């Protein structure tokens, strides 16, 4: 089941614990330390031309998202991965480039309201979840795009949103929050350059999009279940109980 389980790694805090986000060293290649896994950074176009990285991203995705409502497994083939990486700015891989355990790719999207750093896809192999891998990946992306005044992504999983809010300081928009006019216009303006938003209905008032992405395994870990007593975020229940065909939008303005 787990194609990459032989890779050693270093444990980071669980994002549901009441602890600060881990800090990583700067640079394009973070070596492994006791605080987390090694995170390598590649430009999207360079990664798209690297057969090993394309296979790695496809393999991690295919092991991570379970099944469609019709019972067929979610798959991201080599051709689709190549196309997605060609059109993005950064690929981050947790572990090494031959036997990684997680990835994130994303890009900065310009608009007349300023740039936004958008996480286009992130996945961590099931065996390695709740070990800080996603936190390390989002941290690396946030450092690489720190000049952008906003971070955004679409997700069906409240844990992903929690990770981002613990890493990025700033004003958060998620759930029924009545975002300002400028933010609504930004979403409309970037939608053709954003894979998540292209062709989707955007409910700006509730910060959701209706997509065809509804993996049945998404309910594996969506309940608020911290290891230490800590208050549940006000938006958590809204994201936890979204219908399967919807994803939440999160934007953080720094």
What are the language-model segments listed below?
Residues 46-50, 112, 118, 122, ...:
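Amphipathic alpha-helical protein-protein interaction segments
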Residues 124, 130-143:
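Conserved acetyl-CoA-binding loop-helix of GNAT-fold acetyltransferases
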Residues 57-122:
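A conserved beta-strand-loop-helix scaffold within acyl/acetyltransferase catalytic domains
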């Amino acid at each position: 089941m787990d194609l990459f389980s032989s890779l050693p790694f270093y444990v980071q805090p669980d994002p549901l614990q009441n602890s600060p986000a881990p800090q990583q060293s700067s640079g394009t290649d973070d070596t492994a330390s006791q605080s987390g896994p090694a995170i390598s950074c590649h430009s999207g176009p360079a990664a798209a031309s690297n057969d090993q990285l394309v296979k790695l991203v496809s393999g991690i995705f295919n092991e991570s998202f379970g099944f469609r409502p019709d019972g067929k497994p979610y798959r991201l083939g080599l051709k689709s991965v190549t196309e997605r990486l060609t059109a993005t700015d950064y690929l981050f891989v947790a572990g090494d480039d031959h036997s990684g355990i997680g990835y994130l790719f994303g890009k900065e999207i310009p608009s007349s309201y300023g740039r936004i750093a958008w996480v286009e896809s992130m996945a961590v192999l099931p065996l390695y979840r709740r070990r800080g891998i996603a936190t390390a990946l989002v941290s690396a992306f946030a450092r690489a795009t720190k000049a952008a005044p906003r971070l955004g992504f679409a997700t069906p999983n409240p844990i992903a949103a929690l990770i981002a809010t613990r890493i990025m300081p700033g004003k958060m928009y998620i759930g029924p929050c009545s975002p300002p006019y400028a933010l609504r216009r930004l979403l409309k303006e970037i939608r053709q350059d954003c894979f998540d938003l292209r062709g989707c209905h955007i409910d700006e008032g509730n910060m959701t999009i209706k997509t065809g992405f509804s993996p049945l395994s998404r309910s594996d870990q969506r309940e608020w279940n911290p290891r230490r007593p800590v208050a549940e975020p006000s938006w958590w229940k809204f994201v936890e109980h979204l219908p399967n065909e919807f994803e939440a939008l999160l934007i953080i303005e720094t």
